Amino acid sequence: RIEFDPDTTRGTKDRSWGIRPLAGGDQRGAPLPPARSSLFFLWAPLNFNDLCVHYQLFEDSLGRPLSSVGALLPAYDTLAELPDIEDPRARHMRAHEHRLQFDAGSRLAHTADLSFTAVDDGSRHEFHLERIFTFRMKGIGYHHPEWGHGAWKGDLAMASEKWDMETVDDQAFENQHCQHLMRATLGDRVGIGVLEQLCIGPYKPYGFDGFVGRSG
């Protein structure tokens, strides 16, 4: 059992994803043609003392939005405070924007300026993120070449791996999907959060013309 001090610990509860068709890819419907094999994805749950931020965006290779979700939400001190339905204080957002700064020679962001606009009154909200460290999502099965999600390995299979974070190949496909622990600022507020990113294939707004890497 691990005890967390609510005065020093912040967190975000993700929803249940249920059963996901990840092993072997989603075989439903016709496959996408190679020209559309690209994805730009950002997800940023951020925690401040008095509020939380939810920012999610999918865009195509030209930077056109495919899906976006955004909100400013109240922060809760205890589980007992969580509402059964949506809190009426939740403010929904639209018109997501982003400006990322990347590590040399890779697509991994070290800083990000994100913004969106409130649906209720049109006010624009901007927040700045600075990377503290990077977590490689292949460590929990995302795009791992051998131990991907849902891959059947028999009745009992066990393995372990170690990676030297100083020499990880940032050009490799399995290392593109990351979550960065970020120091976040929103006006006078300073908080903590995560920026999850995945950018594969061409992406015109940042000049990416290959499958991975800065220029492919």
Describe the residue ranges of each PLM region.
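Structured soluble/peripheral alpha/beta segments that form catalytic or ligand/cofactor-binding pockets
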Residues: 1-216
